[in-house]
Design a protein with these regions (language model features):
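Bacterial Sec-dependent N-terminal signal peptides
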Residues: 15-39, 145, 157
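Surface-exposed interaction/gating patches
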Residues: 150-163
Length: 225
């Protein structure tokens, strides 16, 4: 009986001495995740174009974490794919294409206020300003497709002179007025001063008719010159 008691006490002492050696469970900590962003822009309907309407020459990418961690900015030239390492979490993304320059790190309010300078007679670079904004969540390796939206509208303009008016109406030139000099990328295209609007050059025209393609920024305030 004494032998049995000694065995039981020895077992308890051994178990107690081993309890301090048991590993403590800790939550898993994940490192940064591999996130790939792919940018595209659908072709516009119609066959006529005076700019490469879907071309992406450069991208300014801004990422703002929901937990107020430091924002990320990446400038990518001549590529439609950007790969980053990001911690798990929720983000707000802003992308701007075809500005032709690295806009650098900016606060979110300044990103939302970005505008693209616009020549009323058309794009100087042959490309169109584009942008995108969305939220996304990272929980592992992630691939995100970003659809860019053009910041200007395509207008197919044409006219003909009806036969009844051909003797009394003579057309010499055509020009568009009140064209904004800037295209809003995220906010409303609201012009606030006359100097922010201009007219296109006058294009020779005649009574036989005229047709052209224009790309026009938004003008909500109807400022005119």
């Amino acid at each position: 009986m004494k032998t049995l008691i000694h065995i039981l006490l020895g077992t308890l002492l051994f178990a107690g001495s081993c309890s301090d050696e048991m590993p403590v469970c800790t939550p898993a900590v994940h490192g940064p995740r591999h996130v790939t962003f792919t940018f595209s822009c659908d072709a516009l309907p119609g066959t006529r174009a005076v700019a490469d309407e879907s071309r992406v020459e450069d991208i300014n990418l801004y990422l703002f974490p929901a937990n107020d961690a430091p924002a990320r900015h990446v400038y990518a030239a001549s590529q439609r794919t950007v790969a980053l390492e990001l911690p798990d979490g929720r983000y707000t993304l802003y992308a701007v294409a075809n500005l032709g320059t690295d806009t650098g790190p900016l606060p979110e309010a300044e990103v939302r206020a970005l505008r693209s300078a616009w020549n009323p007679d058309g794009s100087d670079s042959g490309t169109l300003p584009m942008s995108a904004m969305r939220t996304f969540t990272v929980r592992g390796t992630t691939q995100i497709a970003i659809e860019l939206v053009r910041a200007v509208a395509k207008v197919d303009f044409s006219y003909t002179v009806a036969a009844d008016f051909s003797r009394s109406l003579s057309v010499r030139s055509v020009r568009l007025c009140n064209v904004p000099r800037f295209a809003a990328l995220f906010g409303e295209g609201r012009i606030t001063a006359d100097g922010e609007c201009a007219a296109t050059e006058a294009f020779p025209a005649d009574d036989d008719g005229y047709s052209a393609v224009y790309y026009l920024p938004e003008n909500l305030s109807l400022i005119h010159i």
